[in-house]
């Protein structure tokens, strides 16, 4: 309320805020008809993708964490105590468990880097995959398995869309570092 007053925002303009597991109502009859669900199916406040995944994977108490790799890559941990990184490198938010927090680090282009590579550098993989009746990523992964650990000192910084952890910088850009004549496609 104090912040709304400082910003001169009428509280009546805002929707009610719910905790993640709080029941907010039931589904509408037309939605029930389209989905085959009962009209008594409850709707809850919900949670973001990783916060919901934390509940589903049992990461709901101190000392538990998980990682996900999709477009981005996330290390996600539950905390009963708030811990704010003043530099913003690690993010702390209310979690899906009322009264608790989640702490996470995010790299913006984890899995997306693979898609970018396949679409821009590894286009030959798509052609070969079509010929062989498999997926381009199957062929890419097979070649990755043949690559020596350390990739002959080639380092890739996956900052295709800026970065959040450990560098909060939307202008960060990706780099292949250490590229030499020993590296081939």
Task: Please report, for each region that a protein language model flagged, where it lies by residue.
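Active-site-proximal cap/lid insertion segments
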Residues: 9
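A glycine-/small-polar-enriched, mobile loop at the entrance of the PLP active site in fold-type I
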Residues: 12-22, 103
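Active-site core segments that coordinate phosphate-bearing ligands/cofactors
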Residues: 1, 5-6, 23-25, 29-185
């Amino acid at each position: 309320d104090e912040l709304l007053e400082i910003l001169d925002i009428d509280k009546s303009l805002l929707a009610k805020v719910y905790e993640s597991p709080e029941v907010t109502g039931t589904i509408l009859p037309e939605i029930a008809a389209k989905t085959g669900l009962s009209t008594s199916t409850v709707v809850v406040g919900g949670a973001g993708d990783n916060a919901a995944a934390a509940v589903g994977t049992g990461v709901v108490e101190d000392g538990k964490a998980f990682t996900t790799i999709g477009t981005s890559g996330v290390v996600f941990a539950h905390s009963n105590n708030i811990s704010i990184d003043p530099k913003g490198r690690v993010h702390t938010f209310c979690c899906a468990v009322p009264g608790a927090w989640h702490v996470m680090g995010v790299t913006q282009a984890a899995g997306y880097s693979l898609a970018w590579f396949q679409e821009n550098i590894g286009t030959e993989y798509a052609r070969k995959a079509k010929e062989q009746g498999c997926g381009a990523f199957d062929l890419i992964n097979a070649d990755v398995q043949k690559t020596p650990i350390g990739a002959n000192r080639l380092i890739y910084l996956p900052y295709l869309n800026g970065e959040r952890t450990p560098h909060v910088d939307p202008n960060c850009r990706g780099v292949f570092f250490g590229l030499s004549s020993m590296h081939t496609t």
